[in-house]
Protein backbone atom coordinates (compact mmCIF):
# COMPACT_ATOMS: atom_id res chain seq x y z
CA UNK A 1 0.00 0.00 0.00
CA UNK A 2 1.26 3.48 -0.84
CA UNK A 3 1.93 5.56 2.26
CA UNK A 4 0.19 8.92 2.39
CA UNK A 5 -3.22 9.58 1.02
CA UNK A 6 -4.39 5.99 0.53
CA UNK A 7 -3.17 4.81 3.92
CA UNK A 8 -4.62 7.73 5.86
CA UNK A 9 -7.95 7.77 4.03
CA UNK A 10 -8.27 4.01 4.50
CA UNK A 11 -7.55 4.31 8.23
CA UNK A 12 -10.17 7.05 8.62
CA UNK A 13 -12.62 4.90 6.66
CA UNK A 14 -12.05 1.86 8.88
CA UNK A 15 -12.23 3.86 12.13
CA UNK A 16 -15.42 5.54 10.94
CA UNK A 17 -16.89 2.14 10.03
CA UNK A 18 -16.40 0.73 13.53
CA UNK A 19 -17.56 3.96 15.12
CA UNK A 20 -20.77 3.91 13.10
CA UNK A 21 -21.69 0.27 13.39
CA UNK A 22 -20.44 -0.72 16.84
CA UNK A 23 -20.93 2.44 18.88
CA UNK A 24 -23.73 3.87 16.71
CA UNK A 25 -22.72 7.48 17.34
CA UNK A 26 -21.82 10.42 15.18
CA UNK A 27 -19.09 9.12 12.92
CA UNK A 28 -18.44 12.62 11.61
CA UNK A 29 -16.75 13.50 14.90
CA UNK A 30 -14.44 10.50 14.62
CA UNK A 31 -13.65 11.42 11.03
CA UNK A 32 -12.88 14.95 12.15
CA UNK A 33 -10.61 13.61 14.88
CA UNK A 34 -8.72 11.64 12.23
CA UNK A 35 -8.38 14.71 10.07
CA UNK A 36 -7.12 16.85 12.95
CA UNK A 37 -4.65 14.13 13.93
CA UNK A 38 -3.19 13.86 10.45
CA UNK A 39 -3.17 17.63 10.10
CA UNK A 40 -0.96 17.77 13.15
CA UNK A 41 1.69 15.47 11.65
CA UNK A 42 1.77 16.80 8.09
CA UNK A 43 2.50 20.18 6.59
CA UNK A 44 3.25 21.71 3.23
CA UNK A 45 7.02 21.34 2.91
CA UNK A 46 9.51 23.01 0.62
CA UNK A 47 9.63 19.82 -1.45
CA UNK A 48 5.87 19.95 -2.04
CA UNK A 49 6.08 23.62 -2.99
CA UNK A 50 8.84 22.78 -5.46
CA UNK A 51 6.61 20.16 -7.08
CA UNK A 52 3.79 22.69 -7.40
CA UNK A 53 6.22 25.22 -8.87
CA UNK A 54 7.32 22.62 -11.42
CA UNK A 55 3.72 22.05 -12.55
CA UNK A 56 3.28 25.81 -12.76
CA UNK A 57 6.44 26.22 -14.85
CA UNK A 58 5.32 23.52 -17.30
CA UNK A 59 2.05 25.38 -17.89
CA UNK A 60 3.76 28.74 -18.24
CA UNK A 61 6.30 27.34 -20.69
CA UNK A 62 3.41 26.32 -22.94
CA UNK A 63 2.16 29.91 -23.12
CA UNK A 64 -0.55 29.94 -20.45
CA UNK A 65 0.90 32.76 -18.34
CA UNK A 66 -2.11 34.28 -16.58
CA UNK A 67 -1.91 32.99 -12.96
CA UNK A 68 -5.69 32.98 -12.63
CA UNK A 69 -6.05 30.85 -15.77
CA UNK A 70 -3.42 28.42 -14.51
CA UNK A 71 -5.17 27.98 -11.16
CA UNK A 72 -8.52 27.62 -12.92
CA UNK A 73 -7.29 24.78 -15.15
CA UNK A 74 -5.58 23.01 -12.25
CA UNK A 75 -8.80 23.43 -10.25
CA UNK A 76 -10.76 21.54 -12.91
CA UNK A 77 -8.26 18.69 -12.81
CA UNK A 78 -8.33 18.57 -8.99
CA UNK A 79 -12.12 18.34 -9.17
CA UNK A 80 -11.90 15.53 -11.73
CA UNK A 81 -9.54 13.64 -9.45
CA UNK A 82 -11.75 14.29 -6.41
CA UNK A 83 -14.68 12.70 -8.25
CA UNK A 84 -12.67 9.53 -8.79
CA UNK A 85 -11.51 9.50 -5.15
CA UNK A 86 -15.13 9.69 -4.06
CA UNK A 87 -16.02 6.91 -6.49
CA UNK A 88 -13.39 4.70 -4.87
CA UNK A 89 -15.00 5.38 -1.46
CA UNK A 90 -18.46 4.69 -2.91
CA UNK A 91 -17.32 1.31 -4.24
CA UNK A 92 -15.79 0.47 -0.85
CA UNK A 93 -19.08 1.32 0.86
CA UNK A 94 -21.04 -0.91 -1.53
CA UNK A 95 -18.56 -3.77 -1.25
CA UNK A 96 -17.68 -3.74 2.45
CA UNK A 97 -20.79 -2.26 4.04
CA UNK A 98 -23.44 -3.32 1.55
CA UNK A 99 -24.73 0.24 1.34
CA UNK A 100 -26.95 1.33 -1.53
CA UNK A 101 -24.66 4.05 -2.85
CA UNK A 102 -25.19 5.82 -6.18
CA UNK A 103 -22.05 5.76 -8.30
CA UNK A 104 -20.76 8.93 -9.94
CA UNK A 105 -19.42 7.57 -13.21
CA UNK A 106 -21.50 5.74 -15.83
CA UNK A 107 -20.80 2.02 -16.12
CA UNK A 108 -20.23 2.24 -19.88
CA UNK A 109 -16.75 1.99 -21.40
CA UNK A 110 -16.67 5.75 -21.95
CA UNK A 111 -17.93 6.37 -18.43
CA UNK A 112 -15.19 4.27 -16.88
CA UNK A 113 -12.56 5.77 -19.18
CA UNK A 114 -13.39 9.17 -17.67
CA UNK A 115 -12.08 8.10 -14.26
CA UNK A 116 -8.73 9.60 -13.29
CA UNK A 117 -7.42 6.25 -12.07
CA UNK A 118 -8.01 4.82 -15.55
CA UNK A 119 -7.08 7.55 -18.02
CA UNK A 120 -3.86 8.59 -16.22
CA UNK A 121 -2.14 5.45 -17.57
CA UNK A 122 -2.88 6.27 -21.22
CA UNK A 123 -0.59 8.16 -23.58
CA UNK A 124 -0.69 11.95 -23.81
CA UNK A 125 -2.91 12.18 -26.89
CA UNK A 126 -5.47 9.72 -25.49
CA UNK A 127 -5.57 11.58 -22.15
CA UNK A 128 -6.14 14.88 -23.94
CA UNK A 129 -8.95 13.41 -26.03
CA UNK A 130 -10.70 11.85 -23.01
CA UNK A 131 -10.40 14.94 -20.80
CA UNK A 132 -11.26 17.59 -23.40
CA UNK A 133 -14.01 15.71 -25.28
CA UNK A 134 -15.62 13.64 -22.53
CA UNK A 135 -14.61 14.45 -18.94
CA UNK A 136 -14.82 18.22 -19.25
CA UNK A 137 -18.22 18.30 -21.01
CA UNK A 138 -19.46 15.73 -18.47
CA UNK A 139 -18.56 17.75 -15.37
CA UNK A 140 -20.25 20.81 -16.92
CA UNK A 141 -23.44 18.73 -17.20
CA UNK A 142 -23.18 16.99 -13.82
CA UNK A 143 -26.44 16.65 -11.87
CA UNK A 144 -27.47 14.99 -8.61
CA UNK A 145 -23.92 13.83 -7.96
CA UNK A 146 -23.72 11.87 -11.22
CA UNK A 147 -21.91 12.40 -14.50
CA UNK A 148 -23.82 11.96 -17.77
CA UNK A 149 -23.01 9.19 -20.21
CA UNK A 150 -22.27 9.42 -23.96
CA UNK A 151 -23.87 7.52 -26.83
CA UNK A 152 -21.99 5.43 -29.40
CA UNK A 153 -21.35 8.56 -31.47
CA UNK A 154 -19.74 10.39 -28.55
CA UNK A 155 -22.76 12.65 -27.99
CA UNK A 156 -23.53 13.60 -24.39
CA UNK A 157 -26.75 12.18 -22.94
CA UNK A 158 -28.12 14.83 -20.53
CA UNK A 159 -29.28 13.81 -17.07
CA UNK A 160 -32.97 14.73 -16.65
CA UNK A 161 -34.00 17.25 -14.00
CA UNK A 162 -35.59 15.76 -10.88
CA UNK A 163 -36.34 16.81 -7.31
CA UNK A 164 -33.44 14.68 -6.15
CA UNK A 165 -31.32 16.23 -3.39
CA UNK A 166 -28.16 17.85 -4.64
CA UNK A 167 -24.82 16.19 -3.99
CA UNK A 168 -21.91 18.20 -2.63
CA UNK A 169 -20.10 18.06 -5.96
CA UNK A 170 -23.10 19.72 -7.61
CA UNK A 171 -22.29 22.90 -5.72
CA UNK A 172 -19.07 23.13 -7.69
CA UNK A 173 -20.47 21.83 -10.96
CA UNK A 174 -23.20 24.50 -11.05
CA UNK A 175 -20.51 27.13 -11.70
CA UNK A 176 -19.07 25.22 -14.66
CA UNK A 177 -21.52 26.42 -17.34
CA UNK A 178 -19.15 29.13 -18.62
CA UNK A 179 -15.95 27.20 -17.98
CA UNK A 180 -13.54 26.53 -20.83
CA UNK A 181 -10.76 23.97 -21.06
CA UNK A 182 -7.66 25.80 -22.31
CA UNK A 183 -4.73 23.53 -21.48
CA UNK A 184 -2.81 24.12 -24.73
CA UNK A 185 -1.32 20.72 -25.60
CA UNK A 186 -1.56 17.02 -24.80
CA UNK A 187 2.00 17.04 -23.48
CA UNK A 188 1.28 19.84 -21.00
CA UNK A 189 -1.90 18.12 -19.80
CA UNK A 190 0.02 14.89 -19.26
CA UNK A 191 2.66 16.75 -17.21
CA UNK A 192 0.01 18.41 -15.03
CA UNK A 193 -1.78 15.10 -14.42
CA UNK A 194 1.48 13.29 -13.66
CA UNK A 195 2.57 16.08 -11.32
CA UNK A 196 -0.75 16.21 -9.46
CA UNK A 197 -0.89 12.43 -9.20
CA UNK A 198 2.59 12.37 -7.70
CA UNK A 199 1.58 15.01 -5.15
CA UNK A 200 -1.61 13.19 -4.16
CA UNK A 201 0.06 9.77 -3.99
CA UNK A 202 3.22 10.66 -2.10
CA UNK A 203 2.72 14.02 -0.40
CA UNK A 204 -0.91 14.96 0.19
CA UNK A 205 -2.03 12.96 3.20
CA UNK A 206 -5.56 14.27 3.73
CA UNK A 207 -8.13 16.90 2.89
CA UNK A 208 -6.50 19.52 5.09
CA UNK A 209 -3.25 19.21 3.20
CA UNK A 210 -5.16 19.61 -0.06
CA UNK A 211 -6.50 22.86 1.35
CA UNK A 212 -3.02 24.02 2.30
CA UNK A 213 -1.77 23.08 -1.16
CA UNK A 214 -4.55 25.11 -2.75
CA UNK A 215 -3.73 28.07 -0.50
CA UNK A 216 -0.15 27.91 -1.74
CA UNK A 217 -1.31 28.00 -5.35
CA UNK A 218 -3.63 30.92 -4.63
CA UNK A 219 -0.70 32.83 -3.14
CA UNK A 220 0.65 33.05 -6.69
CA UNK A 221 -2.13 35.46 -7.63
CA UNK A 222 -0.03 38.63 -7.62
CA UNK A 223 -2.20 41.14 -9.45
CA UNK A 224 -5.36 43.00 -8.54
CA UNK A 225 -8.61 42.22 -10.32
CA UNK A 226 -10.30 44.50 -12.83
CA UNK A 227 -12.88 45.60 -10.26
CA UNK A 228 -10.34 46.64 -7.67
CA UNK A 229 -10.42 43.39 -5.70
CA UNK A 230 -7.23 41.76 -4.50
CA UNK A 231 -6.38 38.84 -2.29
CA UNK A 232 -6.17 39.53 1.43
CA UNK A 233 -3.00 38.06 3.00
CA UNK A 234 -3.76 34.95 5.02
CA UNK A 235 -2.30 36.29 8.28
CA UNK A 236 -4.50 39.41 8.04
CA UNK A 237 -7.60 37.27 7.43
CA UNK A 238 -6.74 35.04 10.36
CA UNK A 239 -6.23 38.06 12.62
CA UNK A 240 -9.65 39.44 11.71
CA UNK A 241 -11.27 36.07 12.36
CA UNK A 242 -9.56 35.77 15.74
CA UNK A 243 -10.82 39.23 16.67
CA UNK A 244 -14.43 38.16 15.99
CA UNK A 245 -14.13 34.60 17.40
CA UNK A 246 -16.88 32.87 15.35
CA UNK A 247 -18.69 29.92 16.94
CA UNK A 248 -20.37 26.80 15.46
CA UNK A 249 -23.74 28.56 15.75
CA UNK A 250 -22.76 31.52 13.57
CA UNK A 251 -23.84 32.13 9.98
CA UNK A 252 -20.94 33.75 8.17
CA UNK A 253 -20.92 35.72 4.92
CA UNK A 254 -18.46 37.45 2.62
CA UNK A 255 -20.49 39.30 -0.04
CA UNK A 256 -17.37 39.94 -2.12
CA UNK A 257 -15.78 36.56 -1.54
CA UNK A 258 -13.21 36.28 -4.34
CA UNK A 259 -11.32 33.06 -3.58
CA UNK A 260 -13.27 32.56 -0.31
CA UNK A 261 -10.22 33.25 1.83
CA UNK A 262 -12.19 34.80 4.70
CA UNK A 263 -14.67 31.92 4.74
CA UNK A 264 -11.84 29.39 4.77
CA UNK A 265 -10.08 31.19 7.63
CA UNK A 266 -13.33 31.28 9.60
CA UNK A 267 -13.92 27.58 8.95
CA UNK A 268 -10.43 26.69 10.12
CA UNK A 269 -10.88 28.77 13.28
CA UNK A 270 -14.16 27.03 14.14
CA UNK A 271 -12.65 23.60 13.61
CA UNK A 272 -9.52 24.41 15.60
CA UNK A 273 -11.39 25.88 18.56
CA UNK A 274 -14.75 24.09 18.70
CA UNK A 275 -14.56 20.71 16.92
CA UNK A 276 -14.38 18.65 20.11
CA UNK A 277 -17.69 20.06 21.35
CA UNK A 278 -19.58 20.10 18.05
CA UNK A 279 -22.48 17.66 17.77
CA UNK A 280 -24.07 16.14 14.68
CA UNK A 281 -26.28 19.18 14.03
CA UNK A 282 -23.31 21.52 14.40
CA UNK A 283 -21.36 19.55 11.79
CA UNK A 284 -24.32 19.51 9.44
CA UNK A 285 -24.60 23.29 9.79
CA UNK A 286 -20.83 23.62 9.31
CA UNK A 287 -20.79 21.59 6.09
CA UNK A 288 -23.83 23.17 4.46
CA UNK A 289 -25.26 26.46 5.75
CA UNK A 290 -22.63 28.16 7.89
CA UNK A 291 -20.59 29.83 5.14
CA UNK A 292 -21.94 31.93 2.27
CA UNK A 293 -20.20 34.00 -0.37
CA UNK A 294 -21.20 36.09 -3.38
CA UNK A 295 -19.22 37.30 -6.37
CA UNK A 296 -19.78 38.47 -9.94
CA UNK A 297 -16.73 36.70 -11.34
CA UNK A 298 -17.59 33.14 -12.40
CA UNK A 299 -13.94 32.13 -12.39
CA UNK A 300 -13.63 33.25 -8.78
CA UNK A 301 -16.79 31.33 -7.89
CA UNK A 302 -15.31 28.11 -9.24
CA UNK A 303 -12.08 28.71 -7.35
CA UNK A 304 -13.87 29.65 -4.13
CA UNK A 305 -16.13 26.58 -4.32
CA UNK A 306 -13.08 24.34 -4.71
CA UNK A 307 -11.25 26.17 -1.92
CA UNK A 308 -14.14 25.57 0.47
CA UNK A 309 -14.55 21.93 -0.55
CA UNK A 310 -10.86 21.34 0.12
CA UNK A 311 -11.37 22.80 3.60
CA UNK A 312 -14.14 20.35 4.58
CA UNK A 313 -17.11 22.48 3.47
CA UNK A 314 -19.05 19.77 1.66
CA UNK A 315 -21.78 22.04 0.27
CA UNK A 316 -20.11 25.38 -0.55
CA UNK A 317 -22.74 28.13 -0.64
CA UNK A 318 -21.07 30.49 -3.10
CA UNK A 319 -23.33 32.10 -5.66
CA UNK A 320 -23.21 34.46 -8.60
CA UNK A 321 -24.70 37.66 -7.27
CA UNK A 322 -24.07 41.37 -7.62
CA UNK A 323 -24.21 42.15 -3.92
CA UNK A 324 -24.96 45.84 -4.45
CA UNK A 325 -27.71 45.38 -7.02
CA UNK A 326 -31.48 45.48 -6.75
CA UNK A 327 -31.52 41.72 -7.35
CA UNK A 328 -29.81 41.11 -4.00
CA UNK A 329 -32.71 40.99 -1.57
CA UNK A 330 -30.83 39.51 1.41
CA UNK A 331 -31.81 41.13 4.71
CA UNK A 332 -30.65 40.30 8.25
CA UNK A 333 -29.46 36.81 7.36
CA UNK A 334 -25.99 36.54 8.94
CA UNK A 335 -24.40 36.82 12.36
CA UNK A 336 -20.85 37.45 11.12
CA UNK A 337 -19.60 39.37 8.12
CA UNK A 338 -15.94 39.25 7.03
CA UNK A 339 -14.89 41.10 3.91
CA UNK A 340 -12.36 43.07 1.93
CA UNK A 341 -14.68 44.62 -0.67
CA UNK A 342 -13.45 46.22 -3.91
CA UNK A 343 -12.26 49.80 -3.55
CA UNK A 344 -12.87 50.83 -7.14
CA UNK A 345 -14.23 49.54 -10.41
CA UNK A 346 -17.11 50.22 -12.73
CA UNK A 347 -20.53 50.69 -11.18
CA UNK A 348 -23.87 51.34 -12.81
CA UNK A 349 -25.63 53.56 -10.27
CA UNK A 350 -29.03 52.70 -11.72
CA UNK A 351 -28.63 49.05 -10.69
CA UNK A 352 -27.71 49.78 -7.05
CA UNK A 353 -30.31 48.78 -4.48
CA UNK A 354 -32.32 51.73 -3.19
CA UNK A 355 -31.70 50.83 0.45
CA UNK A 356 -27.96 51.22 -0.03
CA UNK A 357 -28.28 54.47 -1.93
CA UNK A 358 -30.49 56.02 0.75
CA UNK A 359 -27.96 55.36 3.51
CA UNK A 360 -25.02 56.63 1.45
CA UNK A 361 -26.52 59.75 -0.13
CA UNK A 362 -26.68 58.16 -3.61
CA UNK A 363 -22.93 57.62 -3.77
CA UNK A 364 -21.22 55.57 -6.49
CA UNK A 365 -18.29 54.63 -4.27
CA UNK A 366 -18.29 50.87 -3.84
CA UNK A 367 -16.40 50.96 -0.53
CA UNK A 368 -19.25 52.98 1.03
CA UNK A 369 -22.01 50.95 -0.59
CA UNK A 370 -20.53 47.72 0.73
CA UNK A 371 -20.44 49.10 4.27
CA UNK A 372 -24.14 49.91 3.95
CA UNK A 373 -24.69 46.37 2.64
CA UNK A 374 -22.95 44.83 5.65
CA UNK A 375 -25.35 46.68 7.94
CA UNK A 376 -28.31 45.40 5.95
CA UNK A 377 -27.37 41.72 5.72
CA UNK A 378 -26.32 41.36 9.37
CA UNK A 379 -28.83 40.18 11.93
CA UNK A 380 -29.34 42.38 14.96
CA UNK A 381 -26.39 41.65 17.22
CA UNK A 382 -24.28 40.49 14.28
CA UNK A 383 -20.68 41.64 13.98
CA UNK A 384 -18.59 42.76 11.02
CA UNK A 385 -14.84 43.03 10.46
CA UNK A 386 -14.03 44.60 7.12
CA UNK A 387 -11.14 46.31 5.36
CA UNK A 388 -11.64 49.81 3.97
CA UNK A 389 -9.36 52.37 2.33
CA UNK A 390 -8.32 55.21 4.61
CA UNK A 391 -10.54 57.62 2.68
CA UNK A 392 -13.59 56.02 4.26
CA UNK A 393 -12.34 57.15 7.66
CA UNK A 394 -11.86 60.84 6.93
CA UNK A 395 -13.64 61.60 3.62
CA UNK A 396 -15.58 64.85 3.88
CA UNK A 397 -18.29 64.19 1.29
CA UNK A 398 -21.90 63.93 2.45
CA UNK A 399 -21.85 60.19 1.70
CA UNK A 400 -18.71 59.57 3.78
CA UNK A 401 -19.95 61.54 6.78
CA UNK A 402 -23.48 60.09 6.59
CA UNK A 403 -22.24 56.50 6.64
CA UNK A 404 -19.81 57.06 9.51
CA UNK A 405 -22.59 58.81 11.43
CA UNK A 406 -24.95 55.89 10.78
CA UNK A 407 -22.50 53.37 12.22
CA UNK A 408 -21.53 55.50 15.22
CA UNK A 409 -24.97 56.79 16.19
CA UNK A 410 -27.21 53.82 15.36
CA UNK A 411 -24.87 50.88 15.93
CA UNK A 412 -21.81 49.98 17.99
CA UNK A 413 -18.48 50.93 16.40
CA UNK A 414 -15.92 48.94 18.36
CA UNK A 415 -12.51 49.36 16.75
CA UNK A 416 -10.41 50.99 14.04
CA UNK A 417 -7.13 49.23 13.26
CA UNK A 418 -4.94 51.33 10.97
CA UNK A 419 -2.69 49.17 8.78
CA UNK A 420 0.55 50.22 7.03
CA UNK A 421 0.33 50.88 3.30
CA UNK A 422 2.55 47.93 2.33
CA UNK A 423 0.23 45.22 3.66
CA UNK A 424 -1.31 44.61 0.22
CA UNK A 425 1.84 44.78 -1.85
CA UNK A 426 2.54 43.72 -4.56
CA UNK A 427 -1.15 44.22 -5.41
CA UNK A 428 -1.38 47.83 -4.30
CA UNK A 429 0.19 50.34 -1.93
CA UNK A 430 -3.09 51.79 -0.69
CA UNK A 431 -3.40 52.62 3.01
CA UNK A 432 -6.20 50.68 4.68
CA UNK A 433 -7.85 50.06 8.02
CA UNK A 434 -9.99 47.38 9.64
CA UNK A 435 -13.40 48.42 10.94
CA UNK A 436 -15.09 46.30 13.59
CA UNK A 437 -18.70 47.06 14.44
CA UNK A 438 -21.83 45.38 15.76
CA UNK A 439 -25.29 45.95 14.33
CA UNK A 440 -27.60 47.08 17.14
CA UNK A 441 -30.09 49.50 15.52
CA UNK A 442 -30.07 51.19 18.94
CA UNK A 443 -26.66 52.80 19.20
CA UNK A 444 -24.12 51.59 21.72
CA UNK A 445 -20.95 53.36 20.60
CA UNK A 446 -19.25 54.65 23.73
CA UNK A 447 -15.48 54.55 23.34
CA UNK A 448 -13.86 53.56 20.04
CA UNK A 449 -10.59 51.62 20.21
CA UNK A 450 -7.82 52.73 17.86
CA UNK A 451 -4.64 50.78 17.08
CA UNK A 452 -1.76 51.95 14.93
CA UNK A 453 -0.34 48.80 13.32
CA UNK A 454 3.25 49.39 12.24
CA UNK A 455 4.32 45.84 11.28
CA UNK A 456 2.58 42.60 10.28
CA UNK A 457 5.53 40.20 10.25
CA UNK A 458 6.57 40.94 6.67
CA UNK A 459 8.56 43.67 4.95
CA UNK A 460 6.36 46.40 3.52
CA UNK A 461 7.94 46.39 0.06
CA UNK A 462 6.99 44.36 -3.01
CA UNK A 463 9.02 41.35 -1.82
CA UNK A 464 7.11 40.98 1.48
CA UNK A 465 9.86 38.95 3.13
CA UNK A 466 9.31 37.63 6.69
CA UNK A 467 10.66 39.91 9.43
CA UNK A 468 10.64 39.76 13.22
CA UNK A 469 8.52 42.86 13.86
CA UNK A 470 4.85 41.88 14.11
CA UNK A 471 1.98 43.64 15.90
CA UNK A 472 -0.71 41.02 15.25
CA UNK A 473 -0.41 39.15 18.56
CA UNK A 474 -0.42 42.46 20.41
CA UNK A 475 -3.52 43.64 18.54
CA UNK A 476 -5.44 40.49 19.46
CA UNK A 477 -4.31 40.60 23.09
CA UNK A 478 -5.22 44.27 23.58
CA UNK A 479 -8.58 43.87 21.84
CA UNK A 480 -9.43 40.90 24.07
CA UNK A 481 -8.63 43.06 27.12
CA UNK A 482 -10.13 46.27 25.79
CA UNK A 483 -11.37 47.29 29.25
CA UNK A 484 -7.74 47.74 30.25
CA UNK A 485 -7.12 50.21 27.43
CA UNK A 486 -8.79 53.17 29.13
CA UNK A 487 -5.59 54.22 30.91
CA UNK A 488 -3.48 54.36 27.77
CA UNK A 489 -2.21 57.71 26.57
CA UNK A 490 -2.76 59.03 23.06
CA UNK A 491 0.99 58.75 22.49
CA UNK A 492 0.82 54.94 22.75
CA UNK A 493 0.17 52.48 19.92
CA UNK A 494 -3.45 51.97 20.99
CA UNK A 495 -5.96 54.06 22.90
CA UNK A 496 -9.67 54.74 23.37
CA UNK A 497 -11.50 57.80 22.05
CA UNK A 498 -14.87 58.85 23.51
CA UNK A 499 -17.78 58.96 21.10
CA UNK A 500 -18.48 62.64 21.77
CA UNK A 501 -14.97 63.63 20.73
CA UNK A 502 -15.47 61.81 17.43
CA UNK A 503 -18.82 63.54 16.92
CA UNK A 504 -17.23 66.92 17.64
CA UNK A 505 -14.65 66.18 14.93
CA UNK A 506 -17.25 65.59 12.24
CA UNK A 507 -17.24 61.79 12.73
CA UNK A 508 -13.61 61.66 11.57
CA UNK A 509 -12.18 58.18 12.26
CA UNK A 510 -8.59 58.62 11.09
CA UNK A 511 -6.16 57.68 13.84
CA UNK A 512 -3.95 60.72 13.20
CA UNK A 513 -6.85 62.96 14.21
CA UNK A 514 -6.60 61.69 17.78
CA UNK A 515 -3.05 60.39 18.09
CA UNK A 516 -0.65 62.61 20.01
CA UNK A 517 3.02 62.80 19.08
CA UNK A 518 5.67 63.52 21.66
CA UNK A 519 8.21 65.95 20.31
CA UNK A 520 11.63 65.70 21.92
CA UNK A 521 13.06 69.21 22.23
CA UNK A 522 16.23 69.78 20.27
CA UNK A 523 18.94 71.91 21.85
CA UNK A 524 20.77 74.12 19.37
CA UNK A 525 24.11 75.90 20.01
CA UNK A 526 24.09 79.66 20.64
CA UNK A 527 23.60 81.92 17.62
CA UNK A 528 27.11 83.33 18.00
CA UNK A 529 28.57 79.84 17.73
CA UNK A 530 26.49 79.05 14.62
CA UNK A 531 27.63 82.31 12.94
CA UNK A 532 31.26 81.60 13.83
CA UNK A 533 30.99 78.13 12.25
CA UNK A 534 29.43 79.61 9.09
CA UNK A 535 32.21 82.24 8.91
CA UNK A 536 34.92 79.58 9.29
CA UNK A 537 33.28 77.40 6.64
CA UNK A 538 33.06 80.37 4.26
CA UNK A 539 36.75 81.19 4.78
CA UNK A 540 37.65 77.57 4.02
CA UNK A 541 35.59 77.66 0.80
CA UNK A 542 37.31 80.89 -0.29
CA UNK A 543 40.76 79.42 0.38
CA UNK A 544 39.97 76.24 -1.54
CA UNK A 545 38.60 78.27 -4.46
CA UNK A 546 41.77 80.38 -4.60
CA UNK A 547 43.94 77.27 -4.59
CA UNK A 548 41.88 75.75 -7.44
CA UNK A 549 42.28 78.92 -9.53
CA UNK A 550 46.04 78.87 -8.95
CA UNK A 551 46.32 75.31 -10.16
CA UNK A 552 44.27 76.02 -13.27
CA UNK A 553 46.49 79.00 -14.21
CA UNK A 554 49.79 77.09 -13.98
Per-region residue spans from a language model:
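Conserved S-adenosyl-L-methionine
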Residues: 226-339, 344-346, 355-356, 368-369, ...
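Hydrophobic alpha-helical scaffolding
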Residues: 203, 256, 293-297, 336, ...
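Conserved Class I SAM-dependent methyltransferase catalytic core
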Residues: 70, 74, 296, 301, ...
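Non-catalytic, mostly N-terminal accessory regions of nucleic-acid modification and defense proteins
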Residues: 5, 10-243, 247-248, 317-326, ...
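Aromatic/glycine/proline-enriched transmembrane-helix motif characteristic
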Residues: 345-347, 380-381
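C-terminal, active-site-flanking charged/polar segments
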Residues: 412-413, 425-475
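Short, contiguous acidic/charged loop-to-helix segments that flank catalytic cores in large enzymes
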Residues: 65, 348-365, 391-399, 420-427, ...
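Short acidic (Asp/Glu) and glycine-rich catalytic loops that position anionic groups and cofactors
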Residues: 53, 314-318, 350-354, 382-388, ...
Amino acid sequence: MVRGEIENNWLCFVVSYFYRYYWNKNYVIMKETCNLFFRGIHMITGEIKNKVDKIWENVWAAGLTNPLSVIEQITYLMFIRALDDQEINNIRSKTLLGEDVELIFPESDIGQAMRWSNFKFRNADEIYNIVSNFVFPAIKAMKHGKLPDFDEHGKLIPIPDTDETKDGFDFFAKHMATATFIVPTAQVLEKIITGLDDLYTHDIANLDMQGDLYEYMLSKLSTAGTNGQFRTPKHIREMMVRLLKPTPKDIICDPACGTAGFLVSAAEYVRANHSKKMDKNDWKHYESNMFSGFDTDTTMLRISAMNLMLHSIKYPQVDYKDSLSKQNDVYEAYTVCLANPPFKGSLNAATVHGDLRSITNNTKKTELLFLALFLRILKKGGTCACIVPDGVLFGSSKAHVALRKEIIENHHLRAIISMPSGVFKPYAGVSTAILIFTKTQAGGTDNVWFYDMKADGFSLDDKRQPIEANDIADIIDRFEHIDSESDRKRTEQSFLVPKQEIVDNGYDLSINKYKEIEYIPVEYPPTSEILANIKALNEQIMADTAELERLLNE
